[in-house]
């Protein structure tokens, strides 16, 4: 009962705030469209940017690809990472998914116990994230599938997507299509995306063995990064929103 009271109070407060003339800035189109439609706004999307420098195209080395994930492993992401590791093991028993995370709780880390194909590497500073991203052949973007996790990540879009795209590595996304990051990955056309566990191994094989797919993703990724994840572009959109609001005062 308290949840519903707080939810109704929150909705009333949000509607009161948005009843005033103004605009809004969002981190993704999905939440932009929802709020603009609900509150009659003309808000703009300012995507997260990245400091990682793009490296030249590199074909994925089939015999020993460096596969990495950086970030939070809660909200079902640990389960999805374990599933990716299992699928990699079926493709080649020597393949390893390196997972870098600040997580300390064994409740979330323990799922990797006994896996020959997932290595939990612990925490690394952002400078190392940039270095290891540049060294990786495949970077993973992942979300969970359970409703309780999807409800939290439905509109989220983390820095992992911007960093992965900016690096120049091949990017593989896996999770529910209802999650913001996965929906975005699927929509931009330069990230190999899987939203069905039954297709996971097939999707990974396609990325690892199809050089033409890797090239297409790399080249399309250049355009996506330039349009969506460059600081100059994001700054320009932000300034246009602020100037528009100030001009209406």
Each language-model region and where it sits:
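Nucleotide-sugar-dependent
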Residues: 76-79, 127-131, 139-162, 171-183
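A charged, aromatic-enriched C-terminal amphipathic alpha-helix characteristic of glycosyltransferases
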Residues: 195-201, 212-243
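Conserved catalytic-core segment of nucleotide-activated headgroup transferases in glycan assembly
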Residues: 51-54, 59-111, 122-127
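Hydrophobic acceptor-binding patch used for acceptor engagement in glycosyltransferases
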Residues: 24, 138-140, 170-171, 191
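Carbohydrate-associated surface elements
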Residues: 30, 48-49
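Membrane-proximal helix-turn-helix segments that form the acceptor-binding/catalytic region
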Residues: 4-24
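Conserved active-site histidine-acidic residue motif and adjacent donor-binding/catalytic loop
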Residues: 102-106, 118-136, 144, 195
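Conserved acidic donor-binding segment of nucleotide-sugar-dependent glycosyltransferases
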Residues: 158, 176, 189-198, 206-212
């Amino acid at each position: 009962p308290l949840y519903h009271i707080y939810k109704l109070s929150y909705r009333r407060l949000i509607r009161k705030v948005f009843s005033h003339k103004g605009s809004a800035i969002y981190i993704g189109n999905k939440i932009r469209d929802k709020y603009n439609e609900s509150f009659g706004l003309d808000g703009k999307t300012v995507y997260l940017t990245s400091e990682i420098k793009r490296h030249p195209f590199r074909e994925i080395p089939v015999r020993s690809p460096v596969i990495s994930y950086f970030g939070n492993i809660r909200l079902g992401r640990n389960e999805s990472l374990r599933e990716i590791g299992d699928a990699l093991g079926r493709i080649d028993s020597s393949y390893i998914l390196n997972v870098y995370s600040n997580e300390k709780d064994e409740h979330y880390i323990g799922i990797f116990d006994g896996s020959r194909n997932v290595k939990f590497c612990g925490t690394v500073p952002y400078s190392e994230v940039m270095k290891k991203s540049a060294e990786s052949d495949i970077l993973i973007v992942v979300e969970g599938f359970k409703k309780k996790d999807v409800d939290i990540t439905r509109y989220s879009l983390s820095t992992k997507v911007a960093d992965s795209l900016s690096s120049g590595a091949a990017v593989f996304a896996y999770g529910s299509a209802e999650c913001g990051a996965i929906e975005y990955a699927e929509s931009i056309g330069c990230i190999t995306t899987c939203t069905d566990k039954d297709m996971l191994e097939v999707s990974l094989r396609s990325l690892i063995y199809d050089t033409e797919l890797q090239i297409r993703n790399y080249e399309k990724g250049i355009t996506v990064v330039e349009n969506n994840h460059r600081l100059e572009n994001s700054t320009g959109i932000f300034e246009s929103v602020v100037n528009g609001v100030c001009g209406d005062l």
